[in-house]
A protein has these predicted regions:
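Lectin-like carbohydrate-binding module/patch detector with strong preference for beta-trefoil
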Residues: 1-176
Length: 176
């Protein structure tokens, strides 16, 4: 058996060459929906400060429409949909945490935008073994909320980036 090997019809001989394993295909959307359902119970619909996991002095904030790390402790209200995705709504601006342009690629900016219930505004709060949370984008299971350059400092930009498990992608929620 090798890649690009020919398949042909042949009389049964009960060899491994004639044994098949069928794997159920699950679409990327279905995989994300399953993940959202799995982690749905870990988060309550209420208001939080979204803090950096390793440095409580910094949290998710905004400057105009852009989202960045700051020491302002801005409040975000979490709402859930029927599938299990969460949406962050900034209490001050009533705008949602949104992936700019709905593009799931490295370094795509995250900003605040009018709530529109799109996948660009939906997240999965995946609980990590160390107790932190990683926010997976509903656009792509491999892209998560990330602090640009891994620098946890005031006014550092927040973006979408491929999941790499670093502290720049770990957060904690403090209930208000």
């Amino acid at each position: 058996v090798s890649n690009f090997g020919n398949v042909q019809i042949y009389k049964s001989n009960n060899t491994k060459a004639q044994a098949w394993n069928f794997i159920k295909y699950e679409s990327p959307r279905s995989q994300l929906d399953s993940m959202a359902k799995k982690y749905n119970a870990d988060i309550q619909e209420t208001t939080y400060v979204v803090q950096c996991y390793k440095n409580n002095n910094y949290s998710l904030g905004s400057s105009g429409s852009n989202v960045q790390i700051s020491n302002s402790n801005q409040k975000w209200r979490i709402k859930k949909d029927s599938v299990g995705y969460i949406t962050f709504i900034n209490v001050s601006t009533n705008k949602a945490l949104d992936v700019y342009g709905g593009h799931s690629s490295n370094s795509t900016n995250v900003w605040q935008y009018n709530y529109n219930n799109s996948l660009a505004q939906k997240w999965i709060a995946k609980k990590n073994s160390d107790g932190s949370l990683t926010f997976v984008s509903a656009l792509d299971k491999n892209h998560v909320l990330d602090i640009s350059g891994g620098l946890i400092q005031n006014r550092q930009n927040v973006q979408l980036y491929q999941n790499n498990g670093t502290n720049a992608q770990k957060f904690k929620l403090t209930k208000i």
